[in-house]
Each structure stands twice: as structure tokens, then as C-alpha cells.
């Protein structure tokens, strides 16, 4: 709850306080509220005073009740202090079947008289699912795409995108019911040591980041189409990153993952800017407000800003201390950690950029985009191919099955490789999971699954012997019988 106020105020309190206007009386909102029209969308904070900003009504109860209740528990785990968090039901990153215990912070006397706890309890009841996240951003995109008003405008949108659950494709459609595809984390939020599990999680994360990127692109396009781009300051940043180093905490920075968690993107566009530059200095979120003030050529003498403008040549600190769990860690000024992360990601996905590259992890991904009948299976001791009809894909429903599970029952040798083809073209590579032996999870290239009816083919290889029985999560079964491979009773050829 410290990061967003730091962005909007340029200061960090020594102790955590509620991210509300009363605790941050000096902010971009109070600075610009008298001169600008305020278009503000705050997902989890209330930093803009109500006399300056209209507060959106919380999502209606028509949203699926169980999902809202689940989000209450998740948010309490994120926001409540340890003494209350210990009493909550255990969660990892899932969204199901723990809502009955959500009353710990919503009822009774928990938080009574404490502004921070009262704010946390109130916000816990107002969080919706990912569709509401998109609505927040899209409402700002729509407003910014209109011709400029005579009165200058200040847009501020804080969304929890691209937080888990990771379930949205770049076009915004759901690609999985998230409750059925939990992330491979232990009870403390640490990744499994199985790299394949983490690579699959990264695939899902990347797709959802693509959705956010598309919405930001829509904002830029809207500003340009409305003739406003050259007169607008645009700042895009995040409050934290996510570790994908196997065996580390997903959210808490450690020596092995410090750069992943604490190095976040910061993009600044200034009015009239005609070329881009890259600045490798260590910047902080508290530098955003001074930078905006510098662009607008405004200053307030009695403000005690802790950050610096990134545009006036001020020498920035060479090292930055960050709070990581219960300890303080130092982020070094070099880019070695970030470059190492980029090299690891490139090794995980070596077959090109774009969404096809994300669907093609590891050496086995080299065949994504090729026809099944052209595959060279080498000396594989076992191979099986089956066709399964996919129900009509219709993205207007808000869903496209880009995540497919293939389970291999342990009645024979496990396949070494699983590839899934759509209409006889390899569209994704299956990665074996650690906690569920025989389960392979596949992300499909969205370009190879357009709207319409399709046939899906599962191609399994084994270098060590005859294959066992395969099961598609959708319900179709691939089974070896004396008559050959069968799907739902239909005999196939090998």
C-alpha cells in the first residue's frame, strides 16, 4: 500500500499508513485539482480527495458472489498486518473455496477506530475480478480519446493489472478458468524448483502482460487520433515486479531475484518529445511527482519531496534501499541482474518474438508453426497422434481455449514430449508438471486458434518405450487398445 502513494506524492512514510487522502494531503491530486479536470480511477486506494474527484461506486453484487468473496480473502492477505493475517484461511494464488472465512476483517471489531484497518476492510469488499480491472483502464482510454476540453485534464488510473490470476489473452479474452489452473507455489508463495512449471507460469503471465500492453497502446493511439499526444505528459510504471526464478518467492525480493521484483518499467513521454532515450540510472517511484511538476513548470515551496525530477540533470542516488519482507536490501546500480534475467528468458523462449514464441518454449518449441505431417520424430520408441474436435471457438463469448491440459496415466512410459496441433499445425508445446506426474500443460499460439471450428491433434513422443494412456482434460480419451489408439471409442491410426 506504500507504492501508489509514493508515486502520487513523492514521499514515503516511515511507517505504513492507509493510502487515503487524509494521510497524503500533498499530492498530484491536490496540486492539480484546482486547475485541472480530474479523471481518476483508483483500484485499491483513495488518494484523491472526494471534493476533487468523483468516486466510482463499488461493483454491484450482480458480480458472481463467490468470486467477490474469494477476492476479499486474497486482498486481506495482501493488506492486513501479520497479527490479523495469521487468522485468515490459507491461500496461494487461487480464487476458490476459501470465501467462507472472509469475515475475519469484515465483521466484529477488527480495525474499529484504526484508519488503516478500516480502510483495508472497506476496500476488501470493493474488489472485483479481472473484467473490472479492464473496465477501469478502458474508461480512461475512452475519455482520453475525445477531443481536448478547454480546461486541462489530469488522468490517473491505478489498476492491479497484471496481477494474478493470469487468465487473460492479449485480446482480453479468458484463456483458462483460473481456479482450475493454480500456480505452482508452496504455502509460503515460493515457486517450485521444477523449471518447467515456472516456465508455464511465465507463459500465462506474458499473455496477461500483453493484454495490459494492448490497452496502453490503445491509450497512445487514442491520444494521437484526438490530436492530444504532443500536448500530453504520459507516465507508465508499476509498483513491483514478479520473480520467475525457480525456488524463490514470487513477490518478496531475494538475492537471487532482487532485480526481477524491484526493477520495474518507467516510461515518461513529455509534450513535444520527438525521439526516445534510455536512462539506466536508478530511479524510484517517488521521482514521478517531481518529474511531472518539472514538465508542468510548477513548484510548491512548502512541499518536502523526497524524489527528484528525472529531467533536470539532478544526480540520482547510486544505490537504492528497498524493504523486502522484514529486511532491507540494496539494489545495485549495475544492470547485471536485469541482463541475466533477460538472458534466462531468452533461453526459455528461443524461437522468436511475439505470441508464437511464447507458445514455443525450449528446444521442443522449434516445431511450433509446422505441419504435423512434416515432423521428424527421429528414433522415438513410441509415438501417438490423435484428433479431437474442438467446440466452436467464439471470442465474442469472452473465452478462447488457449490453455490445454493433457494427462498421461502411468500405465506405460511417460512421453518425453507433448505437442498440440490445431488443424494439423503445431500450435504449442506441453511441459511436464512436478506435483501432478503425467500432466502436461500447453499454451497455444493465439494466431493458430482463430474463431471457428477446429480439430486439435495431440502428438506424444517417448524415447524410452511404449506410451501409456492419455486423457484430455476436456473429456476425450486417448487409449491404446489391441485394435489401435482410440479416442472416445473411435479407432485411430498411428
Segments from the language model and where they lie:
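Catalytic domains that recognize anionic headgroups
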Residues: 1-494
